[in-house]
């Protein structure tokens, strides 16, 4: 396993017959069974691989608007040994219930909270899971309907880097969270119950890094192939950091490029007009543009590796056209069949 589980528990928040939200609290932590280990390992991997996560910190009431300090205060007591895990998670469940009661779109769910260690850091994972209906075949070959936790489609989840939180009080990114397909407004209650305030615009930082890389290669004496190698190296480094759940470090990235003979990127990035933090989380979807060009519009979708530009793919900005040399075999087959049919 890639994680070492300390404790985990599930509480339920559901509607009663009058439509009021109620908490059903589990009186003790989950046993460290194989089922629990498999569930948390799957959730850890699924969460870590999610791109486009937001990052924030525990807000201060007044300085950060109406940020509620109740969750972070209880977490502090738990970490100090003044509050048990069951009591802490029970308080958190009631905070979430109170926050959910302000909205009319939620049916509740199962609140999973787990403390675990991964790569020498302590984490608190918090997720509101939903049940999903499925069918199974019984021993007598009859069908039966049952419910199971939908682990592959988590939309309301956050992970707190407890080690960073307690070691660096000035950090603004020790809480990561899934933004959710439904948009930020629906996920607001999940951040509000923890008193979380967004602190780092990950996409903006990654976009700025990408711009700095493009300006760096454009101002260098590198050949076209070497420029693409530089882009590929940056993407490779950032992808590795993303997969490890670690931050991009500008100095570390510059050292990687220097090893490839591309000196002075650190001074270039820090000395220019780029407002780059020394460290920030990676966003694969943004940085993928270093390797690929892609776009959709008017019923046309095009995607190709950056190395093909100027060779297999010719762009003419004056005529607003793309010329593709060597049509992919599967596309060529479809086009030939259509022409024969006409």
From Swiss-Prot:
Compartment list: Cytoplasm, Nucleoid
Disulfide bonds: none
UniProt GO molecular function: double-stranded DNA binding; single-stranded RNA binding
InterPro entries documented for this protein: Nucleoid_associated_NdpA (IPR007358)
Source taxon at top rank: Bacteria
Keywords assigned: Cytoplasm
GO cellular component: bacterial nucleoid; cytoplasm
Segments crossing the lipid bilayer: none
Similarity remark: Belongs to the YejK family.
Record-linked PANTHER family: NUCLEOID-ASSOCIATED PROTEIN YEJK, PTHR38772
Cross-referenced HAMAP family: NdpA
Protein name per Swiss-Prot or TrEMBL: Nucleoid-associated protein Shewmr7_2293
């Amino acid at each position: 396993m890639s994680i070492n589980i300390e404790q985990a528990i599930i509480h339920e928040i559901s509607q009663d017959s009058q439509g009021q939200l109620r908490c059903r609290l589990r009186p003790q932590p989950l046993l460290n069974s194989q089922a629990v280990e498999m569930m948390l390992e799957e959730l850890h991997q699924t969460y870590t691989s999610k791109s486009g996560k937001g990052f924030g910190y525990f807000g201060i009431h007044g300085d950060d608007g109406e940020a509620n300090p109740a969750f972070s205060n209880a977490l502090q007591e738990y970490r100090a040994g003044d509050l048990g895990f069951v009591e802490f998670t029970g308080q958190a469940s009631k905070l979430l219930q109170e926050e959910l009661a302000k909205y009319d779109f939620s049916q509740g769910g199962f609140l999973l909270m787990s403390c675990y260690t991964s790569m020498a850091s302590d984490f608190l994972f918090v997720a509101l899971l939903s049940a999903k209906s499925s069918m199974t075949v019984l021993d007598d070959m009859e069908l039966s309907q049952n419910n199971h936790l939908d682990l592959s489609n988590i939309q309301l989840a956050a992970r707190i880097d407890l080690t960073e939180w307690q070691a660096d009080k000035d950090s603004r990114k020790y809480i990561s969270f899934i933004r959710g397909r439904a948009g930020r407004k629906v996920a607001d209650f999940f951040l509000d119950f923890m008193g979380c305030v967004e602190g780092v615009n990950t996409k903006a930082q990654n976009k700025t890094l990408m711009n700095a890389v493009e300006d760096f290669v454009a101002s260098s004496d590198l050949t076209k192939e070497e420029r693409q190698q530089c882009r590929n190296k940056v993407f490779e480094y950032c992808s590795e950091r993303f997969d490890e759940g670690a931050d991009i470090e500008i100095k570390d990235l510059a050292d990687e490029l220097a090893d490839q003979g591309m000196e002075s990127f650190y001074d270039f990035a820090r000395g220019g007009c780029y407002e780059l933090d020394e460290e920030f989380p990676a966003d694969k979807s943004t940085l993928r543009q270093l390797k690929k060009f892609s776009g959709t519009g008017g019923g046309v979708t095009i995607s190709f590796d950056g190395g093909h530009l100027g060779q297999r793919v010719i762009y003419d900005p004056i005529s607003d056209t793309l010329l593709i040399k060597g049509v992919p075999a599967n596309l060529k087959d479809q086009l030939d069949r259509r022409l024969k049919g006409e």
